[in-house]
UniProtKB/Swiss-Prot annotation:
Entry keywords, A to Z: GTP-binding, Lipoprotein, Myristate, Nucleotide-binding
GO biological process: intracellular protein transport; protein localization to Golgi membrane; vesicle-mediated transport
Organism field: Homo sapiens
Lineage: Eukaryota, Metazoa, Chordata, Craniata, Vertebrata
Gene behind this protein: ARL5A
Binding site for GTP: 23-30, 66-70, 125-128, 159
Superkingdom, taxonomy of origin: Eukaryota
InterPro entries: P-loop_NTPase, Small_GTP-bd, Small_GTPase_ARF, Small_GTPase_ARF/SAR
Pfam families found in the cross-reference section: Arf
Annotated lipid attachment (N-myristoyl glycine): 2
Annotated protein name in UniProt: ADP-ribosylation factor-like protein 5A
Annotated GO CC locations: cytoplasm; trans-Golgi network
PROSITE patterns xref list: ARF
Amino acid sequence: MGILFTRIWRLFNHQEHKVIIVGLDNAGKTTILYQFSMNEVVHTSPTIGSNVEEIVINNTRFLMWDIGGQESLRSSWNTYYTNTEFVIVVVDSTDRERISVTREELYKMLAHEDLRKAGLLIFANKQDVKECMTVAEISQFLKLTSIKDHQWHIQACCALTGEGLCQGLEWMMSRLKIR
């Protein structure tokens, strides 16, 4: 009886799942957010603070917070961590010079108590650009295989065309089903 009630509750319960979208400046975070919410590319300028949109997929509601990635704003990322279920890290696959900064910020986040149960989705953005880093290279640079206490997935994407974004959302949806 308890299992049946749980399944019925899940069908009608439209719980909101908090997602934060982080990454260095110019990685494509805002473009990805608006691809999710409007399915189109919008003109963006550097995010000061955050943008927030509700995305509904198959009766599952995600409240997505796109947080500014400039160096001066990164120290305030932790103010968004409370109740976060998923962290989306957007990596600019063309930015070889700052991949080590991305790694440093990633591990700083993962060590935070408020994110101990959060799933991690890495979007390797700008895969349409010639000579960008591959998903395998980014995975190696970020040392993703060393992450043992978080479920994680890396997904190649192009924010401008939307390619790869649905696969990332599908991974998040699959994580919700096994909870």
